[in-house]
Amino acid sequence: MDIICTPLGIISTVHPGQGILDVTASGFQNILLDLSVFCSAGELEWLGNDQEKLKETTRPLKILISEHPTELYNTIKPLLKQYKKACLRTPIAYAPFLLRNTKRKDLSETLYCLALESIRCCDKSGSQYIIIKPLFSGIKREDVWNVNRQFYLRLGKEAKKHDIKILLENQCQEINGHLVRGICSDADEATFWIDRLNEEVGEERFGFCMDVGTCNLCGQNMQEFILSLQKRIKAVVLRDCDGYRESSMLPFTCSKFENCGTDWLGLIRGLREIGFDGELILNFSDTASSFSPLLRPQLMQLAKATAEYFKWQIGIENLLKENKSIVLFGAGNMCRNYMKCYGEKYPPLFTCDNNPKLWGTEFCGLEVKPPESLNTISEDCMILICNIYYREIEQQLRDMGISNRIKFFSDEYMPSFYFDRLERG
């Protein structure tokens, strides 16, 4: 599973050096090739009007990509060179798109040309996937599928030449200032589109990118959404918002009174259930933009850790598969949840606890032993801490001279839960 950082709010296209340094220093190895940065929705909105000032201030080549799509690669080439120098990969790209509330109904062919050139850029940048949003402006609802069918099939021919996969993405639409479900926000519709397109081209050329923020704005059950689309999901955009207004915040930052508005539980459960192992795109552009450049390095480290947390939660069974033998530390609620969800498939040898009253007893079918018993286990046995005092317990075990592999377990996003909690002194 690739973790991919979005450049918005972090990397300037004019002076990208510092942003690239912040990205690589925090441990990111992949960056989204966001081509909409070089041809923004705002630029497209003004296409055909006087944009001389924009040409002078934002384009080193003094041209607008919206007017000259074939110059897209020449425009991004200097940035790609710096990405390569910094050993940053670009596994996935994002094609230019229109504003959600656009007034332009005459740009379908322009968007096609931009998407075509974006696919060609993918071939030169090493990107395997490209996210291309559906056409919507100026199209009657009953014609949306037929218009987009022709749009994507035309692009599919170019994508096949370069062995690039095109990903559709779930959309919101704005009606009188309110965000509601748009094209491909219904999982059944998205499934139909992808399957039909793949059937017509005779191969798996199309897939899906799930935008978590859009699902949240549309008030959707993410687990059901994911289970409907299954393996068609090749990429997931991780971003937080309050469920009412469009924003791209770092996950877990749009919470109130310890409650997250985003359905992270449904997301992780769903992705875990389908065995997701695709592209995990972290978009926290609004969070990044609001922080001082002086704090950016620390923010980037938190962002990387957050993305790694999602990767770990989604693939939690990978951790359990790595070791033939496991011992748990903790004989409480977390241990009970482990045994309920994974005890049969990955049975531990026993569990330990610091509470001497529990030593020699049985808990969830496991013998509870004192921590000192860990000195007798084989070197290849993994110790899995099932207690929220992770780092304190890890330090305790290291101070005891235990050199075994120690990992943490979390029951925050289990397939199922107990509805009661054990209370122990």
Per-region residue spans from a language model:
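Histidine-acidic metal/acid-base catalytic patches
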Residues: 1-27, 46, 184-324, 417-424
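Active-site-proximal loop/turn and secondary-structure-junction residues that shape catalytic pockets
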Residues: 9, 35-39, 96-99, 134-138, ...
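Conserved beta-strand positions in the central sheet of alpha/beta enzyme cores
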Residues: 32, 92, 131, 167, ...
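Active-site acidic/histidine proton-transfer and metal-coordination neighborhood
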Residues: 19, 99-207, 217, 298-301, ...
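Hydrophobic, well-ordered beta-alpha structural blocks that scaffold small-molecule cofactor pockets
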Residues: 299, 303-425
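Short acidic/polar active-site loop segments enriched in Thr and Asp
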Residues: 29, 89, 128, 234, ...
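Generic enzyme active-site microenvironment
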Residues: 32, 167-169, 209-211, 216, ...
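N-terminal pre-domain/capping segments
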Residues: 1-128, 142, 153, 160, ...
